[in-house]
Amino acid sequence: MTKSELIERLATQQSHIPAKVVEDAVKEMLEHMASTLAQGERIEIRGFGSFSLHYRAPRTGRNPKTGDKVELEGKYVPHFKPGKELRDRANIYG
């Protein structure tokens, strides 16, 4: 599901709320989550999961075109850990 599809589905389900208001709310929520992570803070949504930053240590990689070794710097990457309820709901398909 894309962001546009999410906005469309929410606007359809909440027909009393104008689609533009739904779109603005979704965009604002995602922007707030991104800025919270950028500040190094953790986000926890009970029953859904948590978002945090994990550190990737420096390592030696390879250029896929040439095969040459490339030194990659350490960096922080976003990480999502699903909550138990989400794992249980997703497991009905497994």
UniProtKB/Swiss-Prot annotation:
Arranged from A to Z, the UniProt key words for this protein are: DNA recombination, DNA-binding, Transcription, Transcription regulation, Translation regulation
GO:BP terms for this protein? DNA recombination; regulation of DNA-templated transcription; regulation of translation
Extract one GO molecular function annotation from the record: DNA binding
Q: Which parts of the chain span the membrane according to its record?
A: none
User: Which SMART domains does the record associate with it?
Assistant: BHL
| Pfam families hit by this protein | Bac_DNA_binding
InterPro entries, per the entry: Hist_DNA-bd, Histone-like_DNA-bd_CS, IHF-like_DNA-bd_dom_sf, IHF_beta
Q: Which Gene3D superfamilies match?
A: IHF-like DNA-binding proteins
Top-rank taxon of the source lineage equals Bacteria
Annotated GO CC locations: chromosome; cytosol
Q: Which PANTHER family match?
A: DNA-BINDING PROTEIN HU, INTEGRATION HOST FACTOR SUBUNIT BETA
What is the annotated role of this protein in its UniProt record?
A: This protein is one of the two subunits of integration host factor, a specific DNA-binding protein that functions in genetic recombination as well as in transcriptional and translational control.
**Summary of subunit composition and partner proteins:** Heterodimer of an alpha and a beta chain.
- Family listed: Belongs to the bacterial histone-like protein family.
Name of the protein: Integration host factor subunit beta
Can you name the source organism? Answer: Escherichia fergusonii (strain ATCC 35469 / DSM 13698 / CCUG 18766 / IAM 14443 / JCM 21226 / LMG 7866 / NBRC 102419 / NCTC 12128 / CDC 0568-73)
